[in-house]
Each structure stands twice: as structure tokens, then as C-alpha cells.
């Protein structure tokens, strides 16, 4: 994806790709969008130049005292550098209503001191964002779910893949070699997928590896072949151990212990039998439980996780009620993009780092049709002593990206969100909220902005005691405090994502979700042969002895059918040792 800032006469480096825009809002005012503005034509360029000058002037006059010349309130500095606002996600090109800068001034939350922007000034700012900043989709940015479009691709035989890996690993010193593993996209090239689609998988792999990292560093996998289909990783770069890798390969239905001299050399150097896995399977499997939880070492309960993070939520809330230091802040609202009912989100500062936060949501089941929520489920009636039905946890990893955990009403870890409590309305192909996968997609731009509705509601109500009013005021932070902390956490995530170099969108979808949905698609003969690492002729020759593939020469089979029978069929094709042919080494 290429990015043009019209009138700015500047082009972002390709490494950044599409910058991470401002998060969508979570809460009551989240549903609007400015629409598809399209690209300015030549007649508009002069107007854009004038609007750019006017926007710079009005931001200088109204905002620079807090957000420029070294002042960086709310993690926002250089307010008059319009390219910076776009690059760092404070302005979403072509969409004012999803841009932090516009939303803050349009809602009158900013500027904190001084007169709010007038209608004409708001129109100027909105028009500049909607019309004069454009994200231009690259024609090569293709959906991963599209059928392969490059039938001329020549598959890389398995023996050549092994030779490439062997030539790479023998150059490493012994310690590095033992921590080295490989992920392959070669079968996608062999199946006829074009470079643009394979590039999408590269972005998904890069993003996911760092979303699964226990290390403070961002690390991209290293391509070892000219076609960039074979990738090397070092376990230590992600804070993983050999046990972590074993948990991955133990889950792999495509695991094959390859034979031959090259494979033997690799196994000896890496000190492991299963040194290579298919990258698209890894993206699919490791982005969701149980493997997601295993790799990130997320324990069985919310309370154990908080202990690992050095966090005492109960004590923090008690301290906040006593001292009001904004170490804990909440926002409650009626409508959410994920929850069927009202919702509360709560932020804690992680003690290990000023840049890492722990967010906890309190979610509630929808009231039965024709009935009202019970008082202890209605956060406007019970903002302090509610009884939640479940929740989502988001916390910053050491590298600044996010990790996720779904819990039930008792704080026990669950793999999917209860459908009566939460759903993923932004991904109709996968409406069930799957921990990890759905969360990465929903929070692809960091925290979703929330606006509290509780404090104002309670302040106008005679139904609360003086102490309850004070407690609500201390927990449900003022808008400027809550916004500042949200923007701080957004900046932490955005900076980490930029460091990965991964695009925020592939074929119009978040990369990991796009790869997951594509992986679930049907398997044809060419794809099957490529995944086995053999020719289509080799598959057809053995077809009568294979399971689940009897019609693959005429029609596709489902991914589930192909996967369930892979280990057996790999034995029939004699490509190596699987769980179903342990004696193949002697053949």
C-alpha cells in the first residue's frame, strides 16, 4: 500500500506502509464515519493548499500552546506538523470522524483553555482531512482469500527447500543454530499465489510473531531465499524456549520429520527433529487458543495473570478511592462495538513500566427481550457494585504490542466470548469473539477510544449517597484525564507496530484475520500437492490409496478434510515421518 499526502508533497517510507490510524471509538458515539471521500482531482489541489495553510494556522492559534514547542500533552506533540499527525495516527487520511484531532475539537473537549473552534473552522479541518489527505489503495493489495492468479509459478520441491535451509543453518554458530527454526510460505508460491498475496502473509507472520513475543525487542523473521518464502527465526528473539517450540510442533497436524542428508544436517545443527513449519498454519493456529495462551504463558485465571504482572487490582481500586491519583481510571457506556449490553472499561498502570497498561472490561449479558437489566447488571444504577458476566483483558507486552485474555464472570480463562455477552460485528465471516485472533483484529490500531457516560449520569441522580458520588467521581475519571491515558496507550502500540513494519491492512482486512480466513478456504489439487511438497502427478498416482482426497482431481476438499488426513496421506506419499508412519525412515 502506498500513501500520498496531497499538498504535502511527501511520501512515507515503504517500510511503514500504511500508517496505523486512530482507533475506532468504543461507546455511544462510535458509529458514524465521514464516508469515502475519494482522491482530490487537479482542480482541488489549489483549494487543498489553501486549506492546509488555514489548518496549520488554526492549530497554531488554538492548540500549539499544549501540543507543540516541546509540549506533548496526551502524547501529542508537533500539532502544527500535519504530516506528523498523519504519520502517527492522529489524523486518519480521508476520514475526519475517525481522527483523534478532529473528534477532540468537534466534541469541544479541546482546547481545554480558550474558545472552542467555530463551525467554519471545524468545516475547514474536516474538509482538509476528508478530501486533501488520501490513503490510496495499491492495486497490488489483494485479498488473501482470492483464488491463486499466477499459474506460471514453478513450485520449489521439498528437497530444494531443505537444501536452502541446510545452506543457511550451517553458517550459524552452534548456539544460534540450536535456537534457529524456520517457517515456510513456499507452498503458497507453488500453489500459484501471486507475490501480492504472499506479501500479505509476510505481514501477517511478522505481526503475529511480535504479538506473541515475550521479549522487549521487535524482531522481523529473516528471509533466507531470493523468493522470500523461507523464513528463519531465533527462539530467543521472541523470549521463547525449546519447550515453546515443542508446544507449537506438538499441535501441528502438518508436522513431518524429513529424511535425507540435508534434513539430517539440519536436525543435528538445530538439535530438533521438527525444525520447520508452514507459516500460514502457524498464523491460523497460534493466533487463537489454546496455542495462543500457551506461547504467551497466560495462566488459567485473571488473578494469576495479575500476579505475574505484579498487579493488585483490588488494592489499586482501594487506593484510588482513598487518594484519587488516577492510577485507576474507568469509563462506562451504554453501547459498545463488541458487547451486547452496557460496558465498563478500567485501566491500571503496570508497575514494571510507565509505558505499559493493563485494561480490564466488565461485560454484561443482554437483558431478555421485553425486560430491563437487573440492577446489578445496569452500570448506571450500580456503577460501583455491579456483577459482571465476563470480561476482556488487554495488556502491553514488553515490546509495546498487546496481549489478550477473555475471562468468565469468575475470572477464569476462556477461549471464546459467550455469544450472549459479546460478538464480533466487524468480521461477519467470524462473528464469534476468539481470544487473540478477534482481539488483534478489533484492536489493530491499539485501544479503541471510549467516552464515559457514568459520571454525568450519576451526578444528576438523587439515588446515590455522598460517599458513592465521591467514589464514582474518583474512579470514573474526568474526560481529559481518561483521554490523555488512552492516547498514551495508543501511542505506545502505534510505535511498536511501526517498528514491525507490518501493514495494518491486507486486502482490506487486518493481516492476521485475513490469513486466518484464507487458511480456512477449500483445497484444490495444486494446493494439496504444494503442501505435500510434491507434484500434482505424484498425488494423482497415489490418489486411490489416500484418504479424504478421492475427488480432489475434480473438486476441492475442505480444509478440515485435508488437515485431518494430512499425516496419513504424507505417509502414502513417503515424504517423511509423521505420527502415522513412524517406520518410514527405513524405507
At which residue positions do the language-model features occur?
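C-terminal motif of bacterial Sec signal peptides marking the signal peptidase cleavage site
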Residues: 15-17
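Axial heme c-ligation environment in periplasmic c-type cytochrome domains
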Residues: 73-77, 102-126, 136-137, 496-523, ...
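Bacterial N-terminal signal peptides that target proteins for export
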Residues: 1-10
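Solvent-exposed helix-loop boundary motif
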Residues: 20-30, 35, 39, 44-123, ...
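Domain-exit/linker segments immediately C-terminal to small folded modules
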Residues: 142-152, 448-542
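Extended surface/linker regions that mediate inter-domain or inter-protein docking
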Residues: 170-441, 447, 453, 571, ...
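C-terminal non-catalytic accessory extensions
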Residues: 542-587
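Periplasmic/extracellular electron-transfer cofactor-ligation site
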Residues: 56-79, 130-141, 435-453
